[in-house]
Amino acid sequence: MATVPTRSGSPRQLTTKQTGDAWEVQARRWLEGKGLRFVAANVNERGGEIDLIMREGWTTVFVEVRYRRSALYGGAAASVTRSKQHKLLQTARLWLARHNGSFDTVDCRFDVVAFTGNEVEWIKDAFNDHS
């Protein structure tokens, strides 16, 4: 878990949620620097959450953001399991339906932005609804 200095000078521990939120902001800025446009963050639908929704041209990009301090145990990208992929697909399906779309009518993909230590890895089209 990360620490941040406080006004008193002694560091305080960030919660897991605060750490995740900070890395999601980093990922959003990094992707915007690559030309993607921000649509939404922390989208909750029944059964799941999508960290970021971005647009690249006409493509809707659902982004899972992961952070690990080290590559021990496979690093950040390896932590996106089949179960997590299924939840993301279901959440995206519900979000698209709320916006009058579906996987058949909207060009979309699922990316992973993985921060491992000081390294960033952008895995475009990491998985899809046919995986």
Swiss-Prot record:
Regions of compositional bias (Polar residues) in chain numbering: 1-19
> Which portions of the sequence form the region Disordered?
1-20
**Record Pfam families:** UPF0102 (PF02021)
GO MF, any single term? nucleic acid binding
InterPro entries from the UniProt entry:
Restrct_endonuc-II-like, tRNA_endonuc-like_dom_sf, UPF0102_YraN-like
Name the Gene3D superfamilies for this protein: 3.40.1350.10
Give the protein family: Belongs to the UPF0102 family.
Q: Which PANTHER family match?
A: UPF0102 PROTEIN YRAN
Q: What is this protein called?
A: UPF0102 protein YraN
The source organism is Shigella boydii serotype 18 (strain CDC 3083-94 / BS512)
